[in-house]
């Protein structure tokens, strides 16, 4: 069942003793109890032991508070995620994706703020763009074109986010009686009519589920494709060599007897 939007009331603070950092920290504590959706300014005031006007002095509305929470959450997330390195791009990108997923899966509040709410302040958006730039630059150094490096990192990001958000929505649906919560719950799997699906699902595979098996398979597909692009690029002659070869061919043709 969903947690009821109540909070333990602390001893009331003295007037003027609260600051923005305390409010943000308290909001994270309260969100762990009641969820981001049920977080409210009056409830936060009770949790912190202050009048709600003390909160409104710093954050005029809930969205302002959530933006500040997102900034803090994103900075922690960025520092917790390993970098993509050019000299070992495949394994470092794999580890980057795995830890990204693990971080969000282990922290529903982080998932709700960054992935589901997806409203980044200019500061948070700038920080996120800088981290993506670094990852893409290292993929270019590893041998991908800028376009392929961008598409590869974007595909990994979408793959991670899709897996995490689907898992988070599944968790939320578990608290309400909303019928089938996964695709396989709604699909009638009958060995007589769907023998292949029945065979594979009996071995533990799940249809469209954001589980480890499906995540790793999709990640392997993205990395394998990037590897083929790098291999293809390494075999292509460099532009400078192509230009030299073209000039040599022109000279040879001009010097040939007619």
Briefly describe each language-model feature range.
Residues 1-18, 194-204, 234-258:
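N-terminal intrinsically disordered/low-complexity leader segments
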Residues 22, 64, 95, 130, ...:
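Amphipathic alpha-helical interaction segments
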Residues 22, 26-64, 68:
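Helix-turn-helix
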Residues 72-78:
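Short, basic, alpha-helical segments at the C-terminal edge of helix-turn-helix-like DNA-binding modules
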Residues 80-116, 120-130, 146, 153-156:
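Hydrophobic alpha-helical connector segments
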Residues 131-153, 157, 163-181, 204-208, ...:
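Hydrophobic alpha-helical bundle segments that form small-molecule/ligand-binding pockets
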Residues 181-208:
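C-terminal lobe substrate-recognition/regulatory segment of protein kinase catalytic domains
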Residues 212-233:
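A hydrophobic membrane-anchoring alpha-helix module
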């Amino acid at each position: 069942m969903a947690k009821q939007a109540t909070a333990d009331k602390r001893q009331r603070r003295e007037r003027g003793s609260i600051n923005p950092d305390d409010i943000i920290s308290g909001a994270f504590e309260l969100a762990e109890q009641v969820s981001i959706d049920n977080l409210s300014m009056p409830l936060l005031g009770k949790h912190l032991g202050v009048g709600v006007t003390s909160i409104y002095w710093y954050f005029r509305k809930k969205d302002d508070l959530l933006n500040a929470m997102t900034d803090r959450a994103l900075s922690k997330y960025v520092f917790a995620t390993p970098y993509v390195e050019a000299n070992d791009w495949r394994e470092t990108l794999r580890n980057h994706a795995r830890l990204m997923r693990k971080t969000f899966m282990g922290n529903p509040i982080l998932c709700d703020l960054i992935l589901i709410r997806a409203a980044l302040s200019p500061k948070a958006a700038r920080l996120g763009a800088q981290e993506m730039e670094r990852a893409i630059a290292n993929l270019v150094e590893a041998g991908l074109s800028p376009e392929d490096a961008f598409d590869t990192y974007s595909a990994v990001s979408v793959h991670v986010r899709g897996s995490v958000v689907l898992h988070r929505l599944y968790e939320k649906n578990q608290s309400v009686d909303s019928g089938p919560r996964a695709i396989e719950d709604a699909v009638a799997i009958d060995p007589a009519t769907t023998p292949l699906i029945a065979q594979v699902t009996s071995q533990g595979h799940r249809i469209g589920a954001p589980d480890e098996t499906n995540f790793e398979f999709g990640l392997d597909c993205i990395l394998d494709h990037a590897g083929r692009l790098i291999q293809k690029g390494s075999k292509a002659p460099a532009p400078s060599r192509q230009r030299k070869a073209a000039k040599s061919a022109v000279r040879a043709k001009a010097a040939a007897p007619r």
